[in-house]
Amino acid sequence: MDVNPTLLFLKVPAQNAISTTFPYTGDPPYSHGTGTGYTMDTVNRTHQYSEKGKWTTNTETGAPQLNPIDGPLPEDNEPSGYAQTDCVLEAMAFLEESHPGIFENSCLETMEVIQQTRVDKLTQGRQTYDWTLNRNQPAATALANTIEVFRSNGLTANESGRLIDFLKDVIESMDKEEMEITTHFQRKRRVRDNMTKKMVTQRTIGKKKQRLNKRIYLIRALTLNTMTKDAERGKLKRRAIATPGMQIRGFVYFVETLARSICENLEQSGLPVGGNEKKAKLANVVRKMMTNSQDTELSFTITGDNTKWNENQNPRIFLAMITYITRNQPEWFRNVLSIAPIMFSNKMARLGKGYMFKSKSMKLRTQIPAEMLTSIDLKYFNESTRKKIEKIRPLLIDGTVSLSPGMMMGMFNMLSTVLGVSILNLGQKKYTKTTYWWDGLQSSDDFALIVNAPNHEGIQAGVDRFYRTCKLVGINMSKKKSYTNRTGTFEFTSFFYRYGFVANFSMELPSFGVSGINESDDMSIGVTVIKNNMINNDLGPATAQMALQLFIKDYRYTYRCHRGDTQIQTRRSFELKKLWEQTRSKAGLLISDGGPNLYNIRNLHIPEVCLKWELMDEDYQGRLCNPLNPFVSHKEIESVNNAVVMPAHGPAKSMEYDAVATTHSWIPKRNRSILNTSQRGILEDQQMYQKCCNLFEKFFPSSSYRRPVGISSMVEAMVSRARIDARIDFESGRIKKEEFAEIMKICSTIEELRRQK
């Protein structure tokens, strides 16, 4: 029979129908090829927004730099970066006046953090520009390489293990006349194979020393590498994002710590909290505006959009903010915090890999590296690329571009939020001194503005004043993309508000399903996603039960583990049937071994192994939880793992799930082809670094809770720990005298070797 779809919505309030408008099925778009073009776009746009500024030349690097600050006053309707320092400082002063002591307290908190942060903080994060190799690396490797180079150049403050001491080395390194680095390279030789007598190419990996003079080192230290942002939906064009190097990262971390502490105490800030906590915070602001507006007043909300937020921000403005926020603090603290914005005022952007050229016949392909863009004849390029390159040429130095204005994506989210909130704060009646007033929410570049006034003219005047006040600090509200509704309906950071925040469950749809890590993790992540959506996103019990059944079905098809008594034939069904038949307690078999599903919406919080443990045959338990199983390269057993889940919109979220390591927690082996390339040396370094860290954790099992503090090296710490443990074990009779003597001997040998080295 035909069903009229409108009947479905008869009893549903309009706001609950939002989940039916979900446009994002299928995979998001990914970028291919180089990001060079996108980076050039960013650089050219950024300079265009600030074009009336003053040009100067950096005395150290020779880079031309554009400074739009305190230049011409901004104009209506045109996005620009012409912020005025005195306006920013005044906004800061008013923010402090409305929140007495907020800056002071945040400074004290940050000082404490600075004293305690270890350098391994910088190993968090993914890709990082590694200045020693001039390309991207995992954060831990990039840090290890930087420290290694620092030490070989006589910079040793970092050995204390404190981040602040590593940063002292960074500052010192910038004064050095030259820095010596080790680079990996690859030699190819044609040799005759003894067995087959054919000529083969033999590759060897070499390391060579290279000296960088002060200018080249400074350029590298100030470089941000660029990549294309992947998986962005709803955009026609891709855009570039930046990965800073190790010299910048530590300083940025401390600035963001300070700004985060301030944001935590600003009711209009949507950062650093998230999820339900964020919704509660935002609902408060709306409630306040609704309650404080008199019955005669009108209240409107703007769902705001800013034009090119970070391309119009300016590091010099951030420097002014920090100078003001820390004005009564000790000199060292002010210096540490002002370095990040100063480095950003002098930053260089790497153009990435360059351009690919193909001949008409498609036989030949060649890559034009970014370094060649200064000298290459432009007749090879199409019209639009030619324009880009012509614009960018004056700014090019060795394949990097001088980019003084602008911030690049995602660098100072917290601090820029403080700037945004400081303008929202000026909407109080005591500052507007008229009949209209405003308040709102700010989260990085996203904002919602609530304006109250006695009549429509007042609302318009309020919005205009807000718009122009923003202009003075380099924030450009987009008149085209912002829209106004009666207060009670707006959108902010993908949360839709209609008399309360609406659960938009469809946003979470992409995270349902099988992740493809391994059988154990996938089962755990799948049920955790359903559980979390029941808690946070109004996923009802009936729908959750259905989601669970669909997930189990999906899981069984993915891993071909249909129940042992099924008729479905797959590659695995022969083995699974055999297991089914010889198992006494069939309910104890995991789903991935062809067992039945015991999950329902009441027990989603229990890992499957625990759920079925009492039901398992003894020999099955022994096989399942056997750390010595030779076929499984085991993960370290941690009680909680983190999965990255992708909502349809917005950033990837980290989600915790319980992990019980079994013989199903396998890790796929690495692709071998990397071993024949020049990356191999890098890979070996990475593995060695990993091994050292793992060994260290073995000696200090609690090191995940409290790192050993002190100046001693990792080796010394492990040796002294081994001696203490051995003595305790010997005195309590756990080990024999001979074993004790042997351990002591090994410890002495290690120390002896260290002395000789």
Curated annotation (Swiss-Prot):
Compartments reported by the entry: Host nucleus; Host cytoplasm
Domain RdRp catalytic: 286-483
InterPro entries: RNA-dir_pol_NSvirus, RNA_pol_PB1_influenza
PTM annotation: Phosphorylated by host PRKCA.
EC nos: 2.7.7.48
Any Gene Ontology biological process: DNA-templated transcription
Enzyme class name: transferase
Keywords recorded for this protein, A-Z: Eukaryotic host gene expression shutoff by virus, Eukaryotic host transcription shutoff by virus, Host cytoplasm, Host gene expression shutoff by virus, Host nucleus, Host-virus interaction, Inhibition of host RNA polymerase II by virus, Nucleotide-binding, Nucleotidyltransferase, Phosphoprotein, RNA-directed RNA polymerase, Transferase, Viral RNA replication, Viral transcription
Membership in a protein family: Belongs to the influenza viruses polymerase PB1 family.
Job of this protein: RNA-dependent RNA polymerase which is responsible for replication and transcription of virus RNA segments. The transcription of viral mRNAs occurs by a unique mechanism called cap-snatching. 5' methylated caps of cellular mRNAs are cleaved after 10-13 nucleotides by PA. In turn, these short capped RNAs are used as primers by PB1 for transcription of viral mRNAs. During virus replication, PB1 initiates RNA synthesis and copy vRNA into complementary RNA (cRNA) which in turn serves as a template for the production of more vRNAs.
The protein's assembly and partners: Influenza RNA polymerase is composed of three subunits: PB1, PB2 and PA. Interacts (via N-terminus) with PA (via C-terminus). Interacts (via C-terminus) with PB2 (via N-terminus); this interaction is essential for transcription initiation.
Name under which the protein is recorded: RNA-directed RNA polymerase catalytic subunit
